[in-house]
Amino acid sequence: MSKSIFVVCITLLVVLSPTLNAKMVTYPNGDRHCVMAQGQVISACLQQANGLPHADCCYAINDVNRYVETIYGRLALCKCFQEILKDSRFTKLIGMPEKCAIPNAVPFDPKTDCDRFVEHIWLKMF
C-alpha cells in the first residue's frame, strides 16, 4: 500500500509541478519539499465524497504537519498550501485539517494570513 502511495506521489510531483508552477521550498528542518507535501495531500484527499475526509486524507494531512518541527517550517508549509488553494481544482482541500480534527495543523484556507497563524502557534507554546 505504501509503495503505491509513493508511486502516486511521485507521479503527481512530475505531472503537477509544471502545471502549478510549484516551488521547491525546503522546510527549514530539511525533511520535506513543498511539492512533495502538496502531492501527498492531493493524492489522498481529492477522492473524498461530499466534502467529508476519509482516513487516508486525514493521515496525509497529519503526516505533512508532523514533519514540520519549527515555527519557520509551519510558515513554509502554510505558504506552500496557499499556492495550490488558489487553483479551483483544489478547493475541496479547504478546511480539511479542521474536518480531520488535527490540532495545530496548518490551515488549508486561501484567506489565511500565514504570519498570523504562526504567531498564534508561537504564543500557544509559551
UniProtKB/Swiss-Prot annotation:
The keyword tRNA-binding does not apply. Disulfide bonds join 34-80, 45-57, 58-100, 78-114. This is Non-specific lipid-transfer protein 15. Plant non-specific lipid-transfer proteins transfer phospholipids as well as galactolipids across membranes. May play a role in wax or cutin deposition in the cell walls of expanding epidermal cells and certain secretory tissues. Coiled coil: none annotated. Keywords: Disulfide bond, Lipid-binding, Signal, Transport. It comes from Arabidopsis thaliana. The lineage of its organism: Eukaryota, Viridiplantae, Streptophyta, Embryophyta, Tracheophyta. GO terms for molecular function: lipid binding. Residues 1-22 form the signal peptide. Belongs to the plant LTP family.
